Amino acid sequence: MADPEKILKVSVVTPDGIVYSHNATMVAMRAIDGERTIMYDHLPIVTPLAIGEVRVKRTHEMNDRVDHIAVNGGYIEFSNNEATIIADSAERARNIDVERAQSAKKRAEQHMQEAKEKHNEREMLEAEIALRRAVNRLHVRENYGK
């Protein structure tokens, strides 16, 4: 059993509500300046997140299982052993709809091609971001969505 004093609370929140909320021993994510791992008694932090995967190592009662969440940017705030990730969108691996993510990937690729043909840098950037989001969702689902 995990020592109760060594547990942190991890929540992922979007405009649609709470996507994830569990006790854990560790949370790891990609911030815009690189990988970050937070454990019990980490210094307080607020940092922006990149599009990527959040990994949450659950407590010993949960057999140290690791949950995977696709996060499309946002922020993490950590203090008093509570980590809160606020994102525009986030999905647990098991909840990602592969067909929807594949459709989003195809649309983004088409938009990139159209933007390239029009030499429209803004549309190109928007399409690249949409593509990264779709690829992230597919990666998390295909590798961890059991």
Curated annotation (Swiss-Prot):
Region (Disordered): 102-122
Membrane-spanning ranges: none
Places the protein is found: Cell membrane
Example of a GO cellular component annotation carried by this entry: proton-transporting ATP synthase complex
Mode of membrane association: Peripheral membrane protein
GO MF annotations in UniProt: ATP binding; proton-transporting ATP synthase activity, rotational mechanism
Pfam families for this protein: ATP-synt_DE, ATP-synt_DE_N
Keywords: ATP synthesis, Cell membrane, CF(1), Hydrogen ion transport, Ion transport, Membrane, Transport
Matches recorded under InterPro entries: ATP_F1_dsu/esu_C_sf, ATP_synth_F1_dsu/esu, ATP_synth_F1_dsu/esu_N, ATP_synth_F1_esu_C, ATPsynth_dsu/esu_N
Keyword Membrane tagged: yes
Primary localisation category: membrane
Source organism, top-level taxon: Bacteria
Function: Produces ATP from ADP in the presence of a proton gradient across the membrane.
SUBUNIT field: F-type ATPases have 2 components, CF(1) - the catalytic core - and CF(0) - the membrane proton channel. CF(1) has five subunits: alpha(3), beta(3), gamma(1), delta(1), epsilon(1). CF(0) has three main subunits: a, b and c.
Similarity field: Belongs to the ATPase epsilon chain family.
Descriptive protein name: ATP synthase epsilon chain
Native organism taxonomy: Bacteria, Bacillati, Bacillota, Bacilli, Lactobacillales
Gene this protein is translated from: atpC
